[in-house]
Amino acid sequence: MHRIDPSKLELEERVVTINRVAKVVKGGRRFRFAALVVVGDKNGHVGFGTGKAQEVPDAIRKAIEDAKKNLIAVPLVGTTIPHTINGHFGAGEVFLKPAAEGTGVIAGGPVRAVLELAGVQDILSKSLGSNTPINMIRATVNGLSELKRAEDVAKLRGKSVEELLG
């Protein structure tokens, strides 16, 4: 799969979580901050990244850089996704279902951030299994990356869309 050039896109960032993590050493605890960020152009491109640093702004900056390296293209049909899909990652599972125009983004927390920045405006989703933000985001991105348009599937099979849909 080809890499998407982030410099050609107008990306928007959204910080999902900031977590203070500790390393216990002989003299006490050493604190660092872990940031989880989602970036997207609201037009079919989205990515997520993590960063860790001594200070919060540095962790966010690192997470944004990481997210720009992990962009994926999301096939959209109007304001929604082409078909129902389940995204999996670890114990996290996210169910994504296309919705009629005007429904809005029905999703919780981290999943909502990914879907909104991907440019999906109408969708139904349900988080199943793990509700850890990183697992939910990875499961959502996994599901979105496996989406295919009817035209693409028809082309792969050498058929017309009408033949495919019956």
From Swiss-Prot:
Residues of the S5 DRBM domain: 11-74
Entry keyword RNA-binding: yes
Signal peptide (residue range): none
One of the GO biological process terms: translation
Alphabetically ordered keywords of this record: Ribonucleoprotein, Ribosomal protein, RNA-binding, rRNA-binding
GO terms of molecular function: rRNA binding; structural constituent of ribosome
A GO CC annotation given for this chain: small ribosomal subunit
Domain notes: The N-terminal domain interacts with the head of the 30S subunit; the C-terminal domain interacts with the body and contacts protein S4. The interaction surface between S4 and S5 is involved in control of translational fidelity.
Family per similarity comment: Belongs to the universal ribosomal protein uS5 family.
Subunit structure comment from the entry: Part of the 30S ribosomal subunit. Contacts proteins S4 and S8.
HAMAP family tied to this protein: Ribosomal_uS5_B
Biological role stated in the UniProt entry: With S4 and S12 plays an important role in translational accuracy.
Protein name according to UniProt: Small ribosomal subunit protein uS5
Organism ancestry: Bacteria, Bacillati, Bacillota, Bacilli, Bacillales
